[in-house]
Amino acid sequence: MKRQRGMALLSVLLVLTLALLLVEGLVRQQRVTLAATTVYLDTLRLRQALLDAEVRMLAELPRWKNSNPGVVHSRQPWAQPHAWALEDGTRLQGSITDLAGRFNLGWLARPNGRARFERLVQALELTPVALPEGKLLTWREPSQARLLPEVTRPWLARFSPYVAWMPEAGRVNVNTVPAPVLASLGIPLDIARRLEDQAPAEGYATVQAWRGQPGLQGLPLQANDLAVGSRWFRLALTARNGQRRLRLVTDVELAASDGRPRVLRRWIRTIDDEAPAP
């Protein structure tokens, strides 16, 4: 009789143990599901905040007067950093970059594109890389340079801020171009640095005025590659709420007819997973 009671007690204890394990597993699964749902909802809120901020930043782009593009330079309001906060505590930071001030990856398809690329790499004091011979390069992203064996992550991080892809119509904006990109055009680096440092606050009104600067006479610069304005810009936005952070990068083209902005490409990613900026 006592043996039967002992077996019954063991059975009850076994059932209770299994029940507790089952409940513990369900609670753990619920916590994981709740945490994942919280992350998902937080990410959705940050994503929407970024898209709303994108609309706000688009309104900051240079405006055309009477459907005519004007001078674009880095001291205008669009080029200043932006920061604001939302009622839910989300903090947003944004900046706009003139892509016409960068090395155009579309040049790599030109006969002189490789020489320009090599001069840019030299001006940035990077390890020289060998571009594939006899092959038309159609890079659209700086990250495609990773296909080259000499390119490392630090190399790419240094290279990326100076390059972008634009259509063939994209010209270098002499009012926003940094010295290394000027050097890629065949301008000695010391002269390029002086041009960058001594640029007038209001920008150059014409390419001819820029070409009249000391040191540029006699250099084989192609007028069709130069401009004092731009139609291509990059918006970079960061949203932060607590430990959650998202980054949005948007490339924008202004229509040739009236300057109306059109989104070309858009990236959204968590900052922790972020590769070198596009």
Where are these regions (language model features)?
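Compositionally biased linear targeting/interaction segments
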Residues: 2-278
